[in-house]
């Protein structure tokens, strides 16, 4: 059955009605899931298998039947491990119906249907009794309910319910225990993801400083965790202020509480500095003795950094203290971890928490609007002084004292730069109430509330009255729009430029003057795993899962790129970067499609996993800003990516076999089309079997 769905087009700005298959959201969830990544996580799978074997043995040694409850079974992998280890029966719970259906097929294909019952329910809906889903309580609890924050997927309420209703008292649990660790650091780079710094503007009248409003400075920030591949943050980007501190542990074999709690650790700072950021991760022990351990520790805290398992479904956490605080080497402090049923946050206390009534504080929430409008990469981008200097340099070449400037970007400070550089009149368009409110506060904090005109409406709806009867001599954009997911979605600026054409005066300038779409073929060190078939996992056939993911990708996304922040995912360029399409912002959006096709030669040996695409914005003929590669690749092909933007990754299909020799295809063919009527960029990249 087909259904109609409305969708806001991020490129054209229009709302469209699309005919979709009724299961399109299932396909999308599967295509973008981490199932493949988990199946490729060898360390996780081996440790779970070892822990399950040990738990089944302990139960059998007591002369009991081994009855397993597997919550969040996914493919059924852990249940199949349990049966292979000697479990008498497994109840495998999976709430996501397409996944539960796949688990039934995988279990059947591997010959375990007589000992594994897949139950398509949330675990809190499972019943026990003669007429229930389970005839009796289980005595082994196996789960994989964890996310990067450990408890963010509802592990605590699920465990709490399971112990009360589904498993025996003092049951065996795999994992047996989890421990959360934290380390206090000073980091200007990471702090710039959470706070608005003063921005310096060099003008003919000297340096001007754009200061943040007081409530933005004092705001604790967004409540959500910042999860990243912490191993890709250079040690030069932070100063360690504390040892690694075990903050709290959860024993999963006993009753678990989802109630809010706090846990403190006394420590003495290793050096004096500014406490800004808490780095955090966890480990899980699969057995009561703690001999079978799976850790998310970054390389500097890992027991064997040379043998670390790469994974993307579990990473590390960055937490921001509400305010930076000075710390003195050797002067004792208390780091406090707070959590409710789904979230963790941290605070720093000068006195023992038992003596401090403030310690049981509420979860921090943004009350300044900035953290609701700007995500963490956007904060970093706005705080990038070099980037600001590039805009100032470009603006100087196009501004005149009598310029009338219209700025179009979400929550951008370009209007302030234009004013400080001497523009006669500046208008900025903010289509959302949140960005309008935030910019008004920033303007007031800098005494500009009467100098810059904010227009709260969609730019396509501008009237002569909005512009006070003036014609625009400079249309200005970063461009940046909060609805953009892929690099070319910011081509919305081009559609705005077309819509406001009637308001542009003779000889009006547009900045950026143009944009171009670029690409490079790469070999990923690890990211390829998220789209690579698994086939066999610890001796179990999971081809059905591979096929399910492939069908989901073929349904919608096989010919689409997906956004990834590639500074977190090292890769080597195998080709030279090349320009695919150009977009002339000096002219309105054309009526006819823009097309490009050709082949590119691979210059370096390697497994070509994907084509990476990004936009470059040509502010002026002499000044270009890249959202992708920032400099030429090093001799080995190493890439340096813009850390504030996500790049578009088009994975080749079929994925290269990692066991294959490196003498694969030496060319890649491509065909790319930009369709002005929809704003879509349709693309296809594929290996070409060209002989050497």
From Swiss-Prot:
Complexes and interactors: Homodimer and heterodimer. Interacts with CTCFL. Interacts with PRMT5 and SNRPD3.
GN (gene name): PRMT7
Top-rank taxon, per record: Eukaryota
Enzyme active site: 144, 153
InterPro entries linked: Arg_MeTrfase, MeTrfase_PRMT7, PRMT_dom, SAM-dependent_MTases_sf
Modified residues (Omega-N-methylarginine): 32
One annotated GO biological process: genomic imprinting
Described purpose of this protein according to its UniProt entry: Arginine methyltransferase that can both catalyze the formation of omega-N monomethylarginine (MMA) and symmetrical dimethylarginine (sDMA), with a preference for the formation of MMA. Specifically mediates the symmetrical dimethylation of arginine residues in the small nuclear ribonucleoproteins Sm D1 (SNRPD1) and Sm D3 (SNRPD3); such methylation being required for the assembly and biogenesis of snRNP core particles. Specifically mediates the symmetric dimethylation of histone H4 'Arg-3' to form H4R3me2s.
Top enzyme class: transferase
Gene Ontology molecular-function annotations: histone binding; histone H4 methyltransferase activity; histone H4R3 methyltransferase activity; histone methyltransferase activity; protein-arginine N-methyltransferase activity; protein-arginine omega-N monomethyltransferase activity; protein-arginine omega-N symmetric methyltransferase activity; ribonucleoprotein complex binding
GO cellular component: cytosol; fibrillar center; nucleoplasm; nucleus
UniProt main location, coarse: cytoplasm
The protein's name in its UniProt record: Protein arginine N-methyltransferase 7
Location(s) in or outside the cell: Cytoplasm, Cytosol; Nucleus
